[in-house]
Amino acid sequence: YLNGARNRLGSSAAVGGTGFLFSQRILDESHGWRFYLLTEDIEFSIHHILRGERIAICEDAVLYDEQPTDFRQSVRQRLRWAKGYIQVFRRYGADLLKGTARGSWSCFDMSMSILPAFILTALGLLANLTLTALSLMQGDGVWFALRSLLECMGSILATLLVLGGITVASEWRRIHAPAWKKIAFTLTFPLFMLTYLPISMAALFMKVEWKPIHHSVNLTSLPSPAVKN
């Protein structure tokens, strides 16, 4: 969805670690592979966007991504991603902002992608919590503060639910799972995404190192000709 929209707007896409292709020229001009932050795919993308390269997508490409086996592994993976975004922004943030000031939409887009969105969300929640605490101490405006906090949380959850619903609806036939699971997972998707908040906050202070993520896939659950052959 993100890269498709970027491609249609003439902006640069971003590569994903699941799979991407680049020419020997790109590797030669970079003097070999020199991207070793925790999210090296995003680092690779931003490095070349800053050099004026445009990353495109192949609409017909099909990539199979193995997911973490359990919630604990998912937390470990997302903690690495969150820390990686911080690392990338620390290294390339100033150049991205300069590119944005020069009118580069791709630089602006990448800035908004790696600037931890949780910071804005956390600031909004923190402001509402602070207002609630002050109201409780002063004894006035408590319900106003609580309503503001609930509205903030409600808008976040509603937005995530809509995004998840659109994705599942448009990819319904490609998601090989019972209908009830698709619906249940769509409804619980906002709650899953909220777990990014503590994960991302932890990434600000924790020392995060790369650790293997356990993946597994049951081929019999993927009824496709490619698997059968």
Task: Give the role of each language-model region.
Residues 1-38, 79, 86, 90:
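Long helical/loop segments within the catalytic core of UDP-sugar-dependent glycosyltransferases
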